């Protein structure tokens, strides 16, 4: 962990300047060099990891005196996974500083703790860590078809797999079954874990599953979805982009179908 006073010893680093779910890039890449080179306030920087042997530093855009062009984190999905994960971490820490400005315990003003990535109340000294929202995401297979859905926010016609937030007192497997049934009307079986991905929009943790169709007729909930259909591997619509765990689930399901 890099403390505030240690930052001056960083010669060259990757600099993650973040605001909301946006990040600063230079010529399409995370800027690499010294803080002085980019006129960045290194006293406000924190190290969040290392990439290719160099430190990765996080700074909030609000701490800058200069205006910088920002792009969505989604535009970085093609970056190498270790780097994208660090950018996601920077986004989530930035969101922490904005969403936890005041202490939920006593209402006092929170400040960034110098020894760990948490906000700390200046009055009661309570530590508040980044809020992470657990979500499931699942690819459902029915014989040689995969279930894909379209959401109203997908303006480009993109289809993806079913996802939703975990409820209190619910297992991940129960959440998978509930979300699929609520959004599409079908029941699933053979629910099995696939992997996970931090999803900093703004602070979700996507826990991915594969499942098989069990019973029921497809009946989309049009308050949640624009469409839901079974697709064969040769009739796939535009799907979630490479770099997302949704795309990984789709590719795994297609691979499983083709290998049977």
From Swiss-Prot:
Pfam families: NUDIX (PF00293), Zn_ribbon_NUD (PF09297). Gene3D superfamilies: 3.90.79.20, Nucleoside Triphosphate Pyrophosphohydrolase (3.90.79.10). This is NAD-capped RNA hydrolase NudC. It comes from the Bacteria. CDD domains: NUDIX_NADH_pyrophosphatase_Nudt13. The lineage of its organism: Bacteria, Pseudomonadati, Pseudomonadota, Gammaproteobacteria, Vibrionales. The keyword Zinc applies. A divalent metal cation 2 binds at residue 179. Substrate binds at residues 74, 129, 197-204, 246. mRNA decapping enzyme that specifically removes the nicotinamide adenine dinucleotide (NAD) cap from a subset of mRNAs by hydrolyzing the diphosphate linkage to produce nicotinamide mononucleotide (NMN) and 5' monophosphate mRNA. The NAD-cap is present at the 5'-end of some mRNAs and stabilizes RNA against 5'-processing. Has preference for mRNAs with a 5'-end purine. Catalyzes the hydrolysis of a broad range of dinucleotide pyrophosphates. GO terms for cellular component: cytosol. Its cofactor is Mg(2+); Mn(2+); Zn(2+). The keyword NAD applies.
